Amino acid sequence: VPIYQVSHLAGLFSSFNTDVIGSLDFYKSGFPARYGSKMSSVVDVNTKEGSFNDFHGTFAIGLIDGRFQFEGPLWKGKTSFNVGLRRTWTETLTLPIFAVMNKFNRPDKQNARYAFSDFNAKITHKFSETNRLSANFYTGRDALRYLNDNLHEHYDENNEVISERDVVDIAFSWGNILGSLNWDYEISDRMSVRNIAYYSGSYSSLSFSN
C-alpha cells in the first residue's frame, strides 16, 4: 500500500512508529514485480500482528514526544489486535522561548507551534495457520502555526498618537490516511496468494489571516 507523506518535521522523524513495525525491507533496485511500476527505491514496512495469547504493551515519554502501544487477543488463538499512538509536544519547548522573546520585544509578539501525531491499528484473524485476514489503519498529521502580532503607532494630523495592531496568523497542516484489508493464503510451501484492497490518500491545508 503506497504512502505519500513518509516523514514528520521535514524528514527528522519517520512516519512509522517503531513500536508497531513487524518488519522492514529496503530495495535499492531490482525489487520484485509485485511493487508494480515503481521507478526508485522501495521501503516495504509491515505492521506486526498482535499477540494471539496474552495482553501486553509499551509506554514511553521522551523530551519531545510520547508513545503508547498495546496488543492482545480479541478471540484467543484466533483474532488479535495491535494499536500504537505517538505524539510530540514540541510546542512546550517553543512556547517558553517565545515568551522570553516577547518579554523583551513588547510592541511585537510572536508565537510558533508545531506538533505531529500518528495512529496505527491492525486486527488479524486466523482461519488456519495458512489462511488469515487482516485489516490495517493508519493516520498521521503534522500541524504548524505561526502568529505575529505587531503594534504600530503613528501621529495623525492633530498630532495625536494612533495605535494599530497588525496580526498575521498562518496555519498549515498535512498528513496521510490509509486503510487496507489483506487476505493471505498459503497454497503450498512454494506458492501463496495475497489479495489487498486499500485506500491511501494525503491531504494538506493552509490558512492565512491578516
Residue ranges, per PLM feature:
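Short acidic/polar hinge/loop motifs at secondary-structure boundaries
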Residues: 2-27
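Extracellular loop and loop/strand-boundary signature of outer-membrane beta-barrel proteins
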Residues: 8, 54-56, 104-109, 162-169, ...
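Extracytoplasmic
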Residues: 19-21, 38-42, 54-56
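N-terminal secretion/transport leader regions
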Residues: 24-26, 43, 70
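Short beta-strands and strand-coil junctions in structured, solvent-facing domains, enriched
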Residues: 30-33, 67, 90
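Transmembrane beta-strand segments that form the barrel wall of outer-membrane beta-barrel proteins
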Residues: 47-64
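Transmembrane beta-barrel wall of Gram-negative outer-membrane proteins
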Residues: 62-87, 103-147, 171-195, 199
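Outer-membrane beta-barrel translocator domains and adjoining extracellular loop/strand segments
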Residues: 94-100, 140, 146-158, 197-200, ...
